[in-house]
Structure formats: structure tokens, C-alpha cells
């Protein structure tokens, strides 16, 4: 295809015209500045005008692919008070955080959370070793503004976000707690989409997005993501699912049947949990074998059906729980970084480490399991981001630094005994 470029020609004028032209430019610049100031003032007043604040549907990742999070925000002209449906290191679900914000004219009218607020900037930072994090934004361009709805676009990643005013009677803590309860109840990883009684496809659930994996005739695998945001009732898709020309957008969570039921008028659809067959194969008793020859017999129990397992034991009198996740892609089990217990009031964390060296405080770290033998079932674990990290370290952080338990889990192997 040929590309056609149109170039504008700048004509020259005589010096005698300079004074007149400068006057015209001054008039134009003043008018442009006035429009910019008016836009800033309008956006600022509308932000402040929602007495009980706004619901910001904050989507992350390129094209919003990682899904949405609910952030409530109230603006007073200088400060913004935020609360969210997720917890961070320093804030619980619904706990308020205050920081500065500004509305200014740059490349259009922009909203910037320019002082640190953990509830927003959490999404804009790398999450650990070789991990880019959620690829979120903290600077946005206003695309449309009204008292009923504000549309923003992230400056860096270009994701479109929607803000709507909260009704005066909305209790922030209650709303966010209700949403968090749905998140907790529905966080299974294997589902199937059923429309008009017919199964359309199997779907994975990865945090706040569904995934559909397909393998073509050459063996090439493609994964499509369908992001959504949790609501007090269930979920709302970022963009509707489309099946045979029918758009499917809103779902209510049925906890008794572990099913998302579509609430769109005239649509018969649901997203129903199913337990992958391979999950059940890992329940049972194991020998936990370490590099130093130590062998501990433990039971791997169901924690969340189809998703996770728990292994419980004690160290120095402290109850410890290792959570293993079922990996449907590899049909094996993985060990993620996690909080495994509490020691003297401090959270005990599992992180990857190097023998005689450092450890990585990487909350996204995963020790991926692989089957080394089938009889008996033997599973070995490797830190996927850096295979030289053969330690699973248990550490806790006090005000004067990090401390670790004397027990180090090196070259961990699980051997099934029943």
C-alpha cells in the first residue's frame, strides 16, 4: 500500500507585516491560554463536585489486559483521598490514603497523582526481579468530562478508564468489602463458558482476566485475555464477550454453584467452575526431601478446590503453611512467594535465595514444579526467573533489618508415598 504524506508550506511575509502578525499571534495565544485555563477549572470543579467521591475503574496492562481494580477517590482541589478493593503492604482493603493531585494543561488537560500514593503507584512499579509489574499509569488525559462520567486515558500505556460519581448514601468501606468478598469467593482458576446450554470454551482465570488458550495445527500456542472488573454482585467485562453476535457483559456470582450468571437482558450465559482432572492427582502424603538429606513426611491437602493445596508443619514452635498452586498448563504444582506464618508478630515470608548469597524479596516469584519421576511421583522445583536460586528462604523483616529461620529449604523435592 502506498503512503501519501501531505506537507504544509510556510509562506514568508514581508518585514513590514511583522507588527501586525505579532499582534495576531498574541491574540491567538491568549485565546488558547484562556481555553486551557477554562478546561482546567472545569475539570477541577467537576472532580470536587462529587461530594462522596468517584469510583475509578482502574485497568492495568497494555490495553487493560490485566483487568480492573476499584479505586474510590474524593478530591478537594489539592488533596485526594483514596481507598481500594485490594490490600497493599501498608493499607488494608477500604483503608484511606491521602496524597496530592493536580489538574493542569499540558498536552490537553491532565490529571496527575504526582505525589506518592500507594494505592495508585503500586501499579506503576516493577513487582520484583525481572518483572515489569502491572504496567499502570498515574498521569491521565481527560477525554470527556461531565457530572455523570469522566473518561480518562493513561499517558504512558493509553488505557481508557472510567470515573462515575458515588451516590451520597454509599459507604466506602462497605462497598469495597462487598467487592473483596466476591473476589475471595470467586478466585478459582478453571472455568467454562456456557451459552444457551452449550459449552463454548474452557477458560482460565488469572486475577482479573479470563484467558483462553488455543493450539493450532503447527503446535503454536496463543493466549487471549478477556479482562474484567469485580463489582459488589459479580463482574463486569472491560469489553463484552461476543458469541454468535451476542454481547455478554455483566455477571452475578452464585457462590453455592461456583458460577458467574449473566444478568444482561435476554442473554442465557454463564461461566461455570470445573475442577481439572489433574488437580486431584496431587492430594495425599509426601516426603519433603531437602538437599541436606533431611526428610519430613507431610500431607498435601486441598485448600481451594481446583486451584491450590496446603502443607502444614511447625518451625521453632511457629505454625507454617506452604501453599502450592495447581498449574494447569504444566499439569504440576508450583510454589509462589507467600506469607507462610507469623513469628513474634512479624509476617514470615517465603522468597528465593542463592546458597551463601542474597535472597530476592520478589512477591511475584514462583518455584515451578516439574515431574522428575512418576513411580513414585517425584516433583522438583526451580525458580523460573533465576535457576541459580535453589533456596526457599523463610525470612521476616524487623525495623533493623531482615532475619531468617535457621531452616533453609534447598533443592526441595516432594516424593508421594500414597
Which ranges hold each PLM region?
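Bacterial N-terminal signal peptides that target proteins for export
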Residues: 1-8
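C-terminal motif of bacterial Sec signal peptides marking the signal peptidase cleavage site
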Residues: 16-19
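Acidic/polar, low-complexity intrinsically disordered N-terminal segments immediately downstream
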Residues: 21-110, 168-191, 283-285, 411-418
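Edge beta-strand at a domain terminus
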Residues: 21-32, 146-189, 197, 262-282, ...
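N-terminal glycine/threonine-rich, aromatic-flanked beta-hairpin/loop signature
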Residues: 62-108, 196-234, 294-341, 389-390
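Long, acidic/polar, low-complexity amphipathic helices and coiled-coil-like
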Residues: 79-225
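An anionic, turn-rich surface loop/hairpin at beta-sheet edges
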Residues: 112-135, 233-248, 342-371
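Acidic, serine/threonine- and glycine-rich low-complexity intrinsically disordered segments
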Residues: 167-314
Amino acid at each position: 500500500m502506498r503512503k501519501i504524506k501531505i506537507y504544509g508550506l510556510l509562506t514568508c511575509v514581508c518585514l513590514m507585516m511583522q507588527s501586525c502578525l505579532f499582534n495576531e499571534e498574541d491574540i491567538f495565544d491568549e485565546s488558547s491560554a484562556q481555553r486551557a485555563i477554562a478546561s482546567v477549572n472545569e475539570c477541577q470543579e467537576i472532580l470536587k463536585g462529587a461530594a462522596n467521591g468517584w469510583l475509578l475503574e482502574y485497568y492495568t496492562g497494555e490495553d487493560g489486559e490485566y483487568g480492573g481494580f476499584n479505586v474510590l477517590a474524593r478530591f478537594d482541589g489539592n488533596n485526594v483521598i483514596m481507598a481500594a478493593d485490594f490490600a497493599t503492604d501498608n493499607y488494608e482493603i477500604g483503608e484511606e490514603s491521602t496524597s496530592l493531585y493536580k489538574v493542569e494543561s499540558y498536552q490537553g488537560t491532565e490529571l496527575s497523582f504526582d505525589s506518592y500514593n500507594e494505592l495508585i503507584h503500586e501499579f506503576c512499579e516493577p513487582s520484583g526481579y525481572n518483572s515489569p509489574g502491572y504496567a499502570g499509569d498515574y498521569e491521565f488525559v481527560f477525554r470527556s468530562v461531565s457530572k455523570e462520567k469522566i473518561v480518562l486515558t493513561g499517558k504512558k500505556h493509553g488505557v481508557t478508564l472510567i470515573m462515575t460519581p458515588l451516590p451520597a448514601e454509599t459507604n466506602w468501606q462497605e462497598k469495597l468489602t462487598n467487592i473483596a468478598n466476591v473476589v475471595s469467593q470467586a478466585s478459582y482458576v478453571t472455568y467454562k463458558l456456557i451459552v444457551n446450554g452449550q459449552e463454548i470454551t474452557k477458560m482460565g482465570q488469572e486475577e482479573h482476566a479470563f484467558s483462553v488458550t488455543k493450539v493450532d495445527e503447527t503446535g503454536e500456542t496463543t493466549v487471549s485475555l478477556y479482562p474484567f472488573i469485580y463489582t459488589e454482585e459479580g463482574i463486569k467485562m472491560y469489553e463484552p464477550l461476543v458469541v454468535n453476535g451476542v454481547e455478554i457483559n455483566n455477571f452475578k456470582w452464585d457462590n453455592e454453584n461456583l458460577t458467574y450468571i449473566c444478568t444482561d437482558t435476554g442473554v442465557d450465559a454463564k461461566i461455570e467452575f470445573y475442577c481439572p482432572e489433574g488437580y486431584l492427582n496431587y492430594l495425599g502424603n509426601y516426603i519433603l526431601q531437602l538437599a541436606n538429606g533431611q526428610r519430613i513426611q507431610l500431607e498435601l491437602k486441598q485448600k481451594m478446590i481446583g486451584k491450590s493445596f496446603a502443607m502444614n508443619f511447625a518451625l521453632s514452635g511457629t505454625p507454617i503453611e506452604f501453599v502450592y498452586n495447581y498449574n494447569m498448563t504444566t499439569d504440576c504444582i508450583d510454589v509462589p512467594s507467600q506469607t507462610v506464618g507469623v513469628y513474634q508478630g512479624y509476617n514470615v515470608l517465603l522468597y528465593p535465595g542463592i546458597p551463601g548469597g542474597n535472597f530476592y524479596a520478589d512477591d511475584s516469584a514462583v518455584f515451578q514444579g516439574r515431574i522428575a519421576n512418576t513411580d513414585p511421583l517425584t516433583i522438583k522445583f526451580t525458580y523460573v526467573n533465576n535457576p541459580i536460586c535453589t533456596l526457599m528462604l523463610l525470612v521476616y523483616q524487623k525495623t533493623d533489618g531482615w532475619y531468617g529461620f535457621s531452616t533453609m529449604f534447598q533443592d526441595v523435592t516432594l516424593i508421594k508415598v500414597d
